[in-house]
């Protein structure tokens, strides 16, 4: 089942749209619908110009020479995909996006990230793409003729809370794209979180704190003692620091900041943040 109201989390479209499956022999119009769905998923919801479309694989698919799985492979190995999500992105960002585009989920753990990094080192880009599409998970989930789709936004048996929350880091709503709809852009988004197996707050894309993006570790600030009398410390994620400007230049070096605050100082810190124009994205116990 979806976690919380699907519309608030930006996944209602995923939840309401059944998997798209191709049945060979259907009309050209239906084939075109499948092709558009594949471009949308594999290219991360990005706009594809007519001149960028893959004319030869499209024609082969319409003639029944390629299955959905093989057309997905053709798109993922294309120069269009390579230029957008591989050569222009940091390595671990490219791997994160491969998981999103080809398996519809975030990477499980550090070991999974390392194994794909090793494939890139030893066998190259095309072998990395094949490792997803030829894997047992792809075959058992999508088979030969189901278009890959976003998964992981529903709570399921054996799914870790880390993987569940990381899904919402990779997918910021059904209308967002892999790069332009994400503040991380081409930099790794999950790398440090996966290494430390750290779950993240699930923030609605429509909320005031939706613009929060985790800053570098060095940007974290610990206020006061290490813990309260009860031993509790809370992590406050803040975004939107735009107040207190001089000549249109903010006094804050970063618009996104993280504070570690003892319980006794939560109220005081809450007031300070709002006085300075910040928006609290989340408050979670550490």
Swiss-Prot record:
PROSITE patterns: CPCD_LIKE, PBS_LINKER. It is found in: Cellular thylakoid membrane. It is a peripheral membrane protein. Keywords: Antenna complex, Membrane, Photosynthesis, Phycobilisome, Thylakoid. Residues 231-286 form the CpcD-like domain. Induction: By green light. GO terms for cellular component: phycobilisome; plasma membrane-derived thylakoid membrane. Residues 2-179 form the PBS-linker domain. GO terms for biological process: photosynthesis. Transmembrane segments: none annotated. Rod linker protein, associated with phycoerythrocyanin. Linker polypeptides determine the state of aggregation and the location of the disk-shaped phycobiliprotein units within the phycobilisome and modulate their spectroscopic properties in order to mediate a directed and optimal energy transfer. The phycobilisome is a hemidiscoidal structure that is composed of two distinct substructures: a core complex and six rods radiating from the core. Belongs to the phycobilisome linker protein family. This is Phycobilisome 31.8 kDa linker polypeptide, phycoerythrin-associated, rod. It comes from Microchaete diplosiphon. The lineage of its organism: Bacteria, Bacillati, Cyanobacteriota, Cyanophyceae, Nostocales. The gene is cpeC.
